[in-house]
Amino acid sequence: MHDIITTILEDSIRIKRQAVTEQVEALTAAADLLTTCLASGHKILLFGNGGSAADAQHLAAEFVNRFQIERHPLGALALTTDTSVITSIGNDYAFERIFARQVEALGSPGDVAVGLSTSGNSPNVVAALEKAREIGMKTIALTGEGGGRCAPVADILLD
């Protein structure tokens, strides 16, 4: 067990060091894009599956409530929370469209879509990023290494 824990911690340290050298430009670009979006009165739509759905909800909560400092609420919405909408779309269309349909209904040019997918290959995340681009939104993908199928439909890739 000791070796397993040591390996996990060492991997975490390695990934953080790697982010400093390999991801700082993309992280800065994402921060600038989100700042511009919110400052101009637009909103952020976040989505993902499983643990990524939980991450999307957590991020949206931090934007809407507050993060570290008292401030005005910021427009962010996790598309993973309305079970009636999700199951209706999944039933009437397909599970692959549960986020794209919501992006189409709620997104506008100037908004930012943030898709989270560990593999980068979740069909419903890819479809939502594609729909966001189609309607004039900017896109950010948070994925595992390489970005998978999300990479070509992301304006900014954080992998």
Model-identified regions with their sequence ranges:
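A short, well-structured juxtamembrane/interface segment
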Residues: 22-40
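A short, small-residue-rich loop immediately preceding and capping a beta-strand
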Residues: 43-47, 109-120
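Generic N-terminal amphipathic, Lys/Arg-enriched alpha-helix
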Residues: 1-22
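Glycine-rich, small/polar surface segments that engage phosphate groups of diverse ligands
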Residues: 35-107
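Surface-exposed amphipathic alpha-helices with a cationic face
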Residues: 129-133
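Short glycine/serine/threonine-rich phosphate/pyrophosphate-binding segments
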Residues: 52-57, 121-128, 150
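Short, glycine/polar-rich helix-capping loops at beta-to-alpha or helix-loop-helix junctions
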Residues: 141-156
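Short, well-ordered beta-strand core segments
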Residues: 113, 139, 157-158
